[in-house]
Amino acid sequence: MKRTYQPNKRKHLKTHGFRARMSTADGRKILAARRAKGRKRLTVSDK
């Protein structure tokens, strides 16, 4: 049986990256919440 998680960098960034988050109002809410919480990394594109 094939596993459910098949890593793909491009898809990961297209869906969860900073530009993707900024492109929608809800995505910006996520970033605001993570900033408020004090997260070191806001999105997966942060290293």
Curated annotation (Swiss-Prot):
GO terms for cellular component: ribonucleoprotein complex; ribosome. This is Large ribosomal subunit protein bL34. The gene is rpmH. Keywords: Ribonucleoprotein, Ribosomal protein. HAMAP family: Ribosomal_bL34. It comes from Mesomycoplasma hyopneumoniae (strain 7448) (Mycoplasma hyopneumoniae). The keyword Ribosomal protein applies. NCBIfam families: rpmH_bact. InterPro entries: Ribosomal_bL34, Ribosomal_bL34_CS. The keyword Hydrolase does not apply. It comes from the Bacteria. One of its GO terms (biological process) is translation. One of its GO terms (molecular function) is structural constituent of ribosome. It holds the Pfam family Ribosomal_L34. Belongs to the bacterial ribosomal protein bL34 family.
